[in-house]
From Swiss-Prot:
GO BP annotations listed: glycolytic process
Any Pfam family matching the protein: Enolase_C
Cofactor(s) demanded: Mg(2+)
Reaction catalysis annotation: (2R)-2-phosphoglycerate = phosphoenolpyruvate + H2O
Residues holding (2R)-2-phosphoglycerate: Q153, K326, R355, S356, K377
Gene: eno
Protein name: Enolase
UniProt-listed SUPFAM superfamilies: Enolase C-terminal domain-like (SSF51604), Enolase N-terminal domain-like (SSF54826)
């Protein structure tokens, strides 16, 4: 019943107006699934390769679609093994990770459709716990998402005390609105960056003050704890020639960067710090984790790129204590699950994440619930972000 009989591929727009790949998968019993690939702005050096959409579609039609016809959509590993075999490389550089992940997600949805089950139930299996992920909401952004704003790429609201998914989602939206109010009171104009966060032309130090004040205001209104966190995207700050982290006119050595981040964790009680150091510096990650990992999440995104080999190296060296999970970094849901399983076995928290160039696809909301992830990072406002947040609210309402 779940045998794949047809796959359609097309170009659609992502949230930045760039073309991306969308896949439809049809089974012999009429099961249908659709998936669309996101795209990152600050991409890790070791991510799976995204090809131009037209090229990726042409290669997938030629090499992957014939292999997939007749494969059981309900056997996710078989689907993803067929994609790997069709590509023949370690990084999907032949057909493109954008086509691979779109097909992988669409096949999972088609299988769930045949079963008449929500995607999170189909994916969950033994993983599914009783908890729901806490949304991390991007409220101030800079870096690769908004070049004229802060050096730090993301300031994230973290409603850790919210009694429900719904209240957490609305708390993040309230912090986003409160940031606008604080900026207005200070006479600071602000456009929005790639992910819908405010992108004011202010220093990092001023941004900390603004976000801290906004969080305090909303926390007082809602009556539960809200902390905040950072995505520093430090690989984008690190200059190989200078062997230093460059913040405009200021540079920091690796030791100074570690001290800087540790001080921020203490001063602002940060709940989460993503990519605080360069993606190749496992030793520095380990040193920072040893210093502050007992009171905050030190998360590897560019460090790990949802890759089990890189995660294992982090586990062996004590680098970070959590991993950002992005299916398109590795190319298939099966590879994504392998990274999540390895993290869980070794006590690493998992954070399921969107990309800066997104679509209305809601797979990651289901993936976060299915795998009992502690957090989901999928923005705060904007249709491609609220699609996932609203789906998370619906899932929680359905599952409770």
């Amino acid at each position: 019943m779940t045998r794949i009989t047809g796959i359609s591929l097309r170009r659609v727009l992502d949230s930045r107006g760039n073309p991306t790949v969308e896949a439809d998968v049809l089974t012999e019993s009429g099961g249908f699934g659709r998936g669309a690939a996101p795209s990152g702005a600050s991409t890790g050096e070791y991510e799976a390769i995204e090809l131009p959409a037209n090229e990726s579609i042409a290669k997938a039609r030629e090499h992957a679609v014939p292999r997939l016809e007749g494969v059981y959509a309900g056997d996710q590993r078989a689907v993803d093994n067929a994609l790997r075999a069709a590509d023949g490389t370690d990084d999907f550089s032949a057909i493109g990770a954008n086509s691979a992940v779109a097909i992988s997600m669409a096949a999972a949805k088609a299988a769930a459709d045949v079963l008449g089950a929500p995607l999170y139930q189909h994916l969950g299996g033994a993983f599914r716990g009783e908890n729901f992920p806490i949304p991390l909401g991007n409220v101030v952004g800079g870096g690769e998402h908004a070049k004229e704003a802060t050096h730090i790429q993301e300031f994230l609201a973290a409603p850790v005390g919210a009694p429900s998914v719904s209240e957490a989602v609305f708390a993040n939206a309230a912090v986003h609105a409160a940031v606008a109010d604080v900026l207005d009171e200070r006479g600071v104009p602000a456009a929005k960056g790639d992910e819908g966060a405010w992108a004011p032309p202010i220093s990092d130090a001023d941004a900390f003050e603004v976000v801290d004040e906004a969080v305090d205001r909303v926390e007082e209104d809602v009556g539960f704890e809200i902390r905040f966190g950072l995505d520093m995207a430090a690989a984008e700050l690190y200059d190989d020639d200078q062997e230093a982290y460059v913040y405009g006119e200021e540079t920091k050595s690796t030791d100074e960067q570690i001290d800087y981040v540790a001080d921020l964790v203490d001063e602002y009680d940060l709940a989460y710090v993503e990519d605080p150091l360069d993606e190749n510096d496992y030793e520095a990650f380990a040193e920072l984790t040893d210093r502050v990992g007992d009171r905050t999440m030190i998360c590897g995104d560019d460090l790990f790129v949802t890759n089990v080999e890189r995660l294992q190296e982090g586990i062996d060296t004590g680098a970070a204590n959590s991993i950002l999970i992005k299916p398109n970094q590795i190319g298939t849901l099966s590879d994504t699950f392998d990274a999540i399983e390895l993290a869980a076995r070794n006590g690493y928290e998992t954070i399921i994440s969107h990309r800066s160039g997104e679509t209305e696809d809601t797979t990651i909301a289901h993936l976060a619930v299915a795998t009992d992830a502690g957090f989901i990072k999928t923005g705060t406002v904007g249709g491609e972000r609220t699609a996932k947040l609203n789906e998370l609210v619906r899932i929680a309402d359905d599952a409770v």
